[in-house]
Amino acid sequence: MPHNFKPGDLVFAKMKGYPHWPARIDDVKDGAVKPPPNKCPIFFYGTHETAFLAPKDLFPYDKYKDKYGKPNKRKGFNEGLWEIQNNPQASYSLPPASVSSSDSDVPEEKSTARSDEEEKQEASQPILPTASVSASDEEGSEKEGLKRKERITTAPSAKRTKHSSSEQEPDSASSSKEENSDSDQDFTPEKNTPRIQRRITNVGEKNKVLAESESDSKSESEDEKKELKKSPSSSSASSPSLSSSDSETPVKKTPRGRRPAEKPAPKPRGRGRKAEPIPSSDSSDSDSSVDRISEWKKRDEERKRELEERRKKEQEEQLRRLREEEREEDEKKKREKAEKGDKSDSDSDSSKSEVTAPPKPRKSSSSSDSEEDKKQVKEVKPVASEIKKGKKDKVRAISDDSDSDKKVKKTIKKPRPAESARKTNQKEKRGERPRGRPSKVEKEKKKPEMINSRRVVKKEPTVEERLQKLHSEIKFALKVDNPDIKKCLDALEELGGLQVTSQILQKNTDVVATLKKIRRYKANQRVMDKAAEVYSRIKARILGPKSESQQKIAEKVNTAEKGPEDENQTGKAGEDMDASMNGDFLSQRTETAGDKEQELEGLNLDNKAEMETKQNNHAEHNNNPTEETFEPRPISSENQNS
C-alpha cells in the first residue's frame, strides 16, 4: 500500500537515473504551479531542485534511513544528507550562489521584481533561528546592492575574458557571482563578432580591428575585477557561516535536466537584450575601420577597372593585327594555290599527251616539277619567318607594360608557330601529291597483279579436299534428268591424277563405291571405260604392280568362263546403280520391256556359242586347273536358262 504523505514530510525520492535522494514534500503555494493528480511536489536537498513525483517513488526518511542514507559520490548527495539532518527547513527561497548567478543574467527590471518575490517568500516561510535569519537578511540586502553595482559597471562593457573565472577563489559567494557573470558575458563577443566580420572583407583589417577591441575589453575587465574584489570583502566578513555553506553548494551542484528548478523563463531574452548594447568606443572604431575599408575597396576597384580596360584595349588591338596578318597570309595562299592549280592543269594535259610514250621521260618531268615546288616552298619559308619576327617584336613592345599582359600574349604567341609549320607541311604535301600520282595505264596494269597476288595468298586445297570436291562433281554430273558427260570425264581424269593414299581412301570409302558403280554405267560407254581405268590406277598405286598383273590374269579367265553370269550381273548392277545414284531412286526411263527381251535372247545365243567352243577346246585346257574348276558353272547356268 502506498504511504500517505503530507507537506513537510522527509523522504527519499527515487528519480530515473539517480539514487534515492534525500528530499522533502513541499506545500503548494498560492499562485504556484499545481502538481498533476496523484503526484506530490518534491524539494531535493543538496541541489535545491524541485519536481513532481508519484507516491510509489517516495520512501519515508526514518524508515529507509539506514538503507538509502549512505554517502554517495554524486555531487550534492552528501550535502543533501547533511541538510536533511541539520537544516530540514532549507529552501530554494534562501538563494545559494547559483540563484544569484542566474539572476545576474536578467535585466534590471526583472531582477527587482525577483527580489521582491523572494522577500515575500521569506516572510511566508517558517521562522529560522534569529541569528541565521538576520544574517540571511543582511546578506540578501548586500547581494542586491552588489547586483545593482555590477549592472552599472557592466553596462558599458560587453566583453569579458575567461581568465577572471579561473583567477577567483571558489570559497566566497562573491567569487561565484563573478564567475557566473563572466561566463554569461563571454557569450556576448561571440554574438557581436560575426556582425563585425560580415562588414570586414579584408583579412588584414579584420585582424587589426579585433586586436584593438580585445585590448580595450581586457583593460576594462581588469578594472572591474579590482572594484568587485574590494566590494565583496566587507560582505564576506559580516556573514562567514552562511557564505561558507552557500559557497560549498554551487561548487558541488550538478545540472539535473530531469529535476527542473524554478528558473526565470526570460533567460534567453535577457541575454539577447544584453547583447544589443555595444560599447561606444568599439562601435566608433568599427565604423571608422569599415569606412576606411570601403574607401580602400573603392580605390582598389577603380584600379582594377582601369587595368582591365587597358588589357581589353591591348587585346583588341592585338587581335586586329593578327586578323589582318591572317587575312594577308590567306590571300597569299590563295594566290599560290591558283598558280599551282594552273601549273597542275598544264602538267595533267602534258601527261595525258605522253600516255603512249614510255614512262621514263615522265619521271624526269615529275622530278623537275618537284624541284620547282621545293624551291617555291623554300621561298615561302623565309617570308613566314619574317612575319613571325615582326609578330614577336610587336609582342615584346607590348609586354613591357604589365606582367599580367605577358600571360595573355604567351597564349596568343604559342599556337602561331605550330600553325605556320603545319601550313607549310600541307603545302609541300599538296605540291608533291599531283606529281607523284600514277597514270591510268599504270593503274590498269596494277589491277590484275593485285588480283593475282590475292589469289596466291589463298591456301591450296589438300588432296583429301580435292578428292571430296571431285566426288561431289561426279555425282552432280551423272544426274538422271540431265547428265553432263564431259564434266564427269574431266572430273574422273583429275581424280586419276591425284596421289591418293590408303589412309585417305579409308576415310572416303564413298569415292571407291561410286567408281565401282560408274564402271557399270550403261548410259555412256566412255564413262564406264574411264571409271574402270581410274579404279584400276588407284588400285595399282595402293596394292602394287604384282597384284595388278595377277588381277589381269584372273579377270581374263573370269570373263571367259563367267561371261553370261557377269553380263546378267552387270545388267542388274547397272540398273541398281542407275536407280540409286546420287540418292535418285527412280529407275531409268530409257530401257523398255521390249529392249529387255531382245537382250535376253541375245544372251542365250551367246551362251550357246560359247558352250560349243568350250567343248571343242576341252582337250587343250585339261592341264590348267583353274579352267577345270570353273567348267561346271556354265553348265549349270545353261541348264537353268533352258
UniProtKB/Swiss-Prot annotation:
Locations listed in the record: Nucleus; Cytoplasm
Disulfide bonds: none
Region (Disordered): 87-452, 542-642
Domain PWWP: 7-64
Bias (Basic and acidic residues): 107-117, 205-230, 289-352, 372-381, 416-449, 553-565, 607-621
Protein family per UniProt: Belongs to the HDGF family.
Alphabetical keyword list: Coiled coil, Cytoplasm, DNA damage, DNA recombination, DNA repair, Myogenesis, Nucleus
A Gene Ontology BP annotation from the UniProt entry: positive regulation of double-strand break repair via homologous recombination
Highest taxon of the lineage: Eukaryota
Official protein name in the record: Hepatoma-derived growth factor-related protein 2
Coiled-coil regions listed: 294-342, 595-624
SMART domains tied to this protein: PWWP
One Gene Ontology term, aspect cellular component: nucleus
Source organism of the structure: Xenopus laevis (African clawed frog)
Biological role: May act as a regulator of myogenesis. Promotes the repair of DNA double-strand breaks (DSBs) through the homologous recombination pathway by facilitating the recruitment of the DNA endonuclease RBBP8 to the DSBs.
Residue stretches of biased makeup (Low complexity): 90-104, 231-248
An annotated Gene Ontology molecular function: histone H3K9me2/3 reader activity
